Every structure is written in structure tokens, then in C-alpha cells.
Swiss-Prot record:
<feature type="repeat" description="Solcar 3">
    <location>
        <begin position="219"/>
        <end position="304"/>
    </location>
</feature>
<feature type="repeat" description="Solcar 1">
    <location>
        <begin position="2"/>
        <end position="94"/>
    </location>
</feature>
<dbReference type="InterPro" id="IPR002067">
    <property type="entry name" value="Mit_carrier"/>
</dbReference>
<feature type="transmembrane region" description="Helical; Name=3">
    <location>
        <begin position="130"/>
        <end position="155"/>
    </location>
</feature>
<feature type="transmembrane region" description="Helical; Name=2">
    <location>
        <begin position="69"/>
        <end position="95"/>
    </location>
</feature>
<protein>
    <recommendedName>
        <fullName>Mitochondrial glycine transporter</fullName>
    </recommendedName>
</protein>
<keyword id="KW-1133">Transmembrane helix</keyword>
<feature type="repeat" description="Solcar 2">
    <location>
        <begin position="124"/>
        <end position="207"/>
    </location>
</feature>
<dbReference type="GO" id="GO:1904983">
    <property type="term" value="P:glycine import into mitochondrion"/>
</dbReference>
<feature type="transmembrane region" description="Helical; Name=4">
    <location>
        <begin position="182"/>
        <end position="205"/>
    </location>
</feature>
<keyword id="KW-0812">Transmembrane</keyword>
<keyword id="KW-0813">Transport</keyword>
<keyword id="KW-0677">Repeat</keyword>
<keyword id="KW-0999">Mitochondrion inner membrane</keyword>
<feature type="transmembrane region" description="Helical; Name=5">
    <location>
        <begin position="223"/>
        <end position="249"/>
    </location>
</feature>
<keyword id="KW-0472">Membrane</keyword>
<keyword id="KW-0496">Mitochondrion</keyword>
Length: 309
């Protein structure tokens, strides 16, 4: 199998694993963010609100209700993650041929011969990783935005969609602008998120490989998982307000949620600064876990396939 084929397969497996395992986090986050907070007491803890939403979901749809929207999530995430990780790896490999972005960072020490076993990915400077992550994420996000809209609306309880094809047909009939709804907010969230994630992931992984030399595949997988979880936590908190804005635009139908700036103003008027962090704990939990699972599966899969060929 070619390198690109290996990357697509590993990326697809990564997307499948994270989506199936963590869909309840996504659904609860969407339900929490879709509201305007008018039914919540200002001092009410988020944990209590999340528990109420969870009970409502289980009451109306049983435990399976927590996995509502899994199909559109898979439709978006499996090819999306495969395309993103493959494109990111290919772009980084291309950028690594440039003296402006190729990483020269190296810390020689005893056992240095094993240092490359922690990763099979191209090495770039921090600036290169930032640009590669942001550029790739926005490009893939543009292609898959229609599925993001579909996923958000399927997870929401505002729309009574009975089938995936029926939901997609309704969105298509509403016009091209509906297919790209929320793309600006998504880009403002995803570009810095992906850029920061790759920078911190590679940086933490580089340093961790000297604390725990990845002599075995198990140690390498542990480094990948912990590095990705840490990077995911940092990048998530830095970009969460744009996630709230994106969800409002894609799910709410009122006029005040049709534009990026008007949505920002509406959230501020109704909730203040706290409104921009609705669902932050859920997104943080999901991103930390999905980053750890996703990148451990991706890099581990690549290392396994390359050592077996």
C-alpha cells in the first residue's frame, strides 16, 4: 500500500474510533449551545444543566438517544479525518523540503538512535506546523461544511428530521448559502485550533520522547496519546467561543442568528461573556479524548503498517 493509502486508512480508522466512542459528548454540547439560556438561572452550575439535558435525551430516546446523529457524524468525520490527516502529512512533507520550514531541532543524548521511533511524521518548525495545521483544516472544512451543518441539525432537537437523506435534501433545497452556513465561524475556530494543536502536539511529543524514550510501540503510543490530549486541551480553550457562534448560526433559524457579527452581539446581550463558553467542559472532554484516541490510532497505525511492509 502506498504512503497516501496508509495515511487515508489510518486517518479513517482514527475518525471512526473517535466518533463512535465520543458521539454523546458532541450531542450534549450541541443541545447545550443551541439554547439562549433563557430557561437557565444565571448562577446555575453547568454540571446541573448538562445532567438535565442528559436526562431529557434519555427520557425521549433511551440510551440510544445519546448516539443520535452518529450517522451524519460518521459521514463527515471518517472521510474528513482521513482527508485532513493525509493532507496535513502531505503538506508537511512538502514544506519540510523548504529551508524556511524544515525543523533542525535536535537534542543529542545517550540512546539518540531511538529518537525517531516516536513518530513517522515530517518535522517542521513551529511556524511551519502552525501554517500547515491551519491551512489544511480550513481547506478540508470548506469541502465538508455541508456535512457539518447536517450533523449539527441532526444532533439538535429543533429539527424533526426522520432520515439522513431527507435532512440533506431539505438543506440543499434551501440554497447554496445554507450549505456553507457557519463556515466563517468554523474557520475562525478551526484555523487557530488546528495550527495551535499541531504546534503543541509536536512540541510536547518532542520533549516527552526524552523523558520516556519510545523504545517500544506501547511507549510510542502513550507519548502520542498524552501529547495529543495536552495539545487538544490548550487549543480547545483558546478557540471555544467560535464553536458556540458556529453552532448558533447553523442550528438557530431566527434572524439575529443569520450573521456572524449579529450572532456575537446576540450572545453577548443574552448571556454576557459566559455565553461564549457554553458547552466548554463537554467540548474540552471530547477534544482531549478524541485527540488522544485519534492521534494514537493514526500514528500507531502508520508505524504498524510501515514496520509490517
Amino acid at each position: 500500500m502506498s504512503n497516501v493509502g496508509q495515511q487515508l486508512l489510518s486517518g479513517g480508522l482514527s475518525g471512526l474510533a473517535t466518533t463512535v466512542c465520543l458521539q454523546p459528548f458532541d450531542l450534549l454540547k450541541t443541545r447545550l449551545q443551541q439554547g439562549d439560556g433563557s430557561t437557565w438561572r444565571p448562577t446555575r452550575p453547568h454540571t446541573s444543566i448538562i445532567l438535565d439535558i442528559t436526562r431529557d435525551v434519555i427520557h425521549s430516546g433511551g440510551w440510544r438517544g445519546l448516539w443520535r446523529g452518529t450517522t451524519p457524524s460518521l459521514v463527515r468525520n471518517v472521510p474528513g479525518v482521513a482527508l485532513y490527516m493525509t493532507s496535513l502529512t502531505q503538506l508537511r512533507a512538502l514544506m519540510a523540503t523548504s529551508p524556511y520550514f524544515a525543523s533542525l531541532r535536535r537534542r543529542p543524548q545517550n540512546g539518540d538512535a531511538n529518537k525517531n521511533t516516536s513518530s513517522v511524521l515530517p518535522k517542521l518548525t513551529s511556524q511551519g506546523n502552525l501554517i500547515a495545521g491551519a491551512t489544511t483544516r480550513v481547506g478540508v472544512g470548506f469541502l465538508l461544511n455541508p456535512f457539518s451543518v447536517l450533523k449539527a441539525r441532526f444532533e439538535s432537537n429543533i429539527y424533526a428530521y426522520e432520515s439522513l437523506t431527507g435532512a440533506f435534501g431539505t438543506i440543499v433545497r434551501q440554497g447554496p448559502s445554507e450549505l456553507l452556513r457557519g463556515f466563517l465561524a468554523s474557520s475562525l475556530r478551526d484555523a487557530p485550533y488546528a495550527g495551535l494543536f499541531v504546534v503543541f502536539y509536536e512540541g510536547i511529543k518532542h520533549e516527552a520522547s526524552y523523558v520516556l524514550p519510545p523504545v517500544t510501540s506501547t511507549q510510542a503510543t502513550l507519548i502520542h496519546g498524552l501529547s495529543a490530549a495536552s495539545a487538544g486541551a490548550i487549543a480547545t480553550m483558546a478557540t471555544h467561543p467560535f464553536d458556540v457562534i458556529k453552532t448558533k448560526i447553523q442550528v438557530r433559524t431566527e434572524a439575529q442568528y443569520h450573521g456572524f457579527l449579529t450572532t456575537i452581539a446576540t450572545i453577548w446581550k443574552q448571556r454576557g461573556i459566559t455565553g461564549y463558553f457554553d458547552g466548554a467542559s463537554l467540548r474540552m472532554s471530547r477534544k482531549v479524548l478524541s485527540s488522544a484516541i485519534g492521534w494514537a490510532v493514526y500514528e500507531g497505525g502508520l508505524m504498524l503498517m510501515r514496520t509490517s511492509t
